[in-house]
Amino acid sequence: MARGGMRVGEVLKLTPNDILDRKLILNDTKSGKEQELIFIPQKVADRLKEYVRATNIGSDKKIFPICYGAARAMVKKAGQLVGIRLRPHDLRRHAATFASRSNVPLEIISKVILRHSNLSTTQIYLGKVSDAEAIRWIENLYA
């Protein structure tokens, strides 16, 4: 979720059949489209494929056969281990913020990573800027 900007529900629906090279094929999407493609880093694709092989998951079975509550609890616990409050959707927000801070164009973040139909929805995700970050950008802009 943090690398691909996926929604927790999308992750929980994934099957081995949905993995195609460096892409994930999402069916029955929130947007109402029949299918959507998600581009993922090669390392993530490799780890997913390794996990599927190691656990001998059937091609039409869910890769992560847990409910939303269990996924939420896992993410929350991971956050507690590092001393932060963390929810599944925060990982999606992180993907957008990381891409933005890596100078990925807003249109790519919106249409490819988050798959929003409206750019203004993406801007809500990226609207929170710390004072330190604002000062750094202003200093660099007018240096």
Place the predicted regions along the sequence by residue:
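Short, basic (Lys/Arg/His-rich) helix/loop patches that form interaction surfaces
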Residues: I57-K61, R72-V112, D131
